[in-house]
A protein has these predicted regions:
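N-terminal metal-binding scaffold of metallo-dependent hydrolase/deaminase domains
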Residues: 1-42, 53
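Alpha-helical scaffold segments that flank or form the walls of functional sites
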Residues: 72-143
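Hydrophobic faces of well-ordered beta-strands that scaffold small-molecule active sites
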Residues: 58-62, 120-122, 145-149
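A short, flexible beta-alpha/helix-coil linker loop
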Residues: 8, 90, 152-155
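Active-site-proximal beta-alpha core segment in soluble small-molecule metabolic enzymes
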Residues: 132, 146-160
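Active-site beta-loop-alpha junctions enriched in small/polar residues
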Residues: 65, 125-126, 150-155
Length: 160
């Protein structure tokens, strides 16, 4: 695969590299190199040209709660337990409904793609079918994830 664009990446801690208007050649799953001019050996191969766009590496999120994405941005005025009781527990209980869960998971996975988060470690809910469906949809979306269920046995309602 060959890409052309403006690439920004960090090859080492504290180091930032910008490559403007260059070609990135990928062979298999590895970067074969960046080039100002495309080497003759790659002539005639298709090039994905991103124009003036900035191309960034994907992000990895190592700790997130997938079911809480539907209530993100609410309740910043509350401490943790009141926030859980007011917003999180009621919405997480709804994941027992597989139709609700599927729609929510699809929105969640679209958000991961939109944010450039292609790998993540996520908690689902205690609902087995919903958790399995999140795993299936994640794979279908072309994302990589470690997905587990929450094991909370204190300060949670009986529904969770």
């Amino acid at each position: 695969m060959i890409f052309k664009g403006n690439f920004l990446y960090t090859p080492a801690l504290g180091e930032l590299t910008v490559r403007e208007g260059e070609y990135l050649v990928v062979e298999g799953e590895k970067c074969a190199g960046f080039y100002r001019a495309l080497p003759q050996e790659y002539a005639g191969q298709p090039v994905t040209d991103f124009g003036r766009a900035l191309v960034l590496p994907a992000f990895c999120d190592l700790h997130l709660h997938a079911p809480q994405m539907v209530n993100r941005g609410v309740g910043y005025d509350q401490e943790l337990l009141p926030w859980l009781e007011t917003y999180t527990f009621p919405v997480e209980a709804r994941y027992g409904d597989t139709d609700f869960a599927e729609a929510a998971w699809k929105r969640f996975l679209n958000r991961m793609w939109a944010n450039g988060t292609l790998r993540f470690s996520a908690f689902a809910t205690i609902h087995k079918e919903a958790a399995w469906r999140l795993m299936e949809l994640t794979e279908q979306a072309g994302l990589s994830a470690l997905i587990g269920k929450v094991n909370m046995d204190r300060n949670a309602p009986d529904s969770l």
